[in-house]
Amino acid sequence: STVHEILCKLSLEGDHSTPPSAYGSVKDALNIETAVKGVDEVTIVNILTNRQDIAFAYQRKELPSALKTPAQYDASELKGLGTDEDSLIEIICSRTNQELQEINRTDLEKDIISDTSGDFRKLMVALAKRAEDGSVIDYELIDQDARDLYDAGVKRWISIMTERSVCHLQKDKVLIRIMVSRSEVDMLSLYYYIQQDTK
């Protein structure tokens, strides 16, 4: 937010009794006077003159959340998720196996089970339990998985997407080539074909 940006830019160091020479204090004072006509100017002046205290209090309040490790931050985002499925998807799908272990898989699985339902719950729990990330990519297995996905439909798709490593699933050069080399008409045809095939 704008308030956050302003308060974070205020310096807590140095002598603030005299403004820097480039500081346009007269111009700023006139702008503030114009902006606050008809409001409680005394309160605004009192607040602005105590900006050092405000900045220090604000930064002290923000500091504990800034000191969290990425895993602690993710865990706090997932606690009491309720309906925030976007955060759940982003964290579960983009973190490595090691990062998910740092979040604490037991608590993570409990949170997922308590806050989701149906096939979405099954998919999220399976992703949270996925096998170790492998740095070795088996290209023959990738080709077989692609065929299996095409032939088997959704159930096999969930199995492959949750049991394979992130490296295994990221053959993005092929996708990028297809997206760049095909016209919009071809892409729409592919979309409709896939829609019909998955019904």
Swiss-Prot record:
Compartments reported by the entry: Secreted, Extracellular space, Extracellular matrix, Basement membrane
GO biological process: positive regulation of receptor-mediated endocytosis involved in cholesterol transport
Modification N6-acetyllysine, positions: 37, 171
Predominant location category: secreted
Modified residues (Phosphoserine): 25, 135
Keyword list, A-Z: Acetylation, Annexin, Basement membrane, Calcium, Calcium/phospholipid-binding, Extracellular matrix, Isopeptide bond, Phosphoprotein, Repeat, Secreted, Ubl conjugation
Protein name: Annexin A2
Native species: Mesocricetus auratus (Golden hamster)
